[in-house]
C-alpha cells in the first residue's frame, strides 16, 4: 500500500465555486482508478486542508499522478486555488487495527 498525504492552504482569493466540481471529479476519477483504496478530506480549525489517498501500489499511484485530468486539476489548483501545498508519499512501516469484535489485529 502507498499513502499520499496532501496538506494545503487556500489562497484568500481562491476560486471556491470552481473548486467544488473539480474536487468532486478528482474523487470520482481517483476512485475509479485501478488499485484505489480510499480518499478522505479533512480541514483543521486553522483552515489547513488534509487529504489522504491510498493506492495498493506505487505503479497505480503513478497512473493516478500522471492521469491527464489529474494533471490539469493540479495546474488549476496552482493557478487559482492554493496558496501552498505539500505532498508526502508514504509506505507503511507497521499497520494494525482495533475493533470491539476482534480486538487488536496486526496487518502486514
Please give the residue ranges for each predicted region:
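Short S/T/G/P-rich N-terminal loop/turn motif that feeds into the first structured element of a domain
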Residues: 1-48, 58-66, 82-108
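Conserved hydrophobic/aromatic residues on the N-lobe beta-strands of protein kinase domains
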Residues: 51-52
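Short arginine-rich
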Residues: 74-77, 83-84
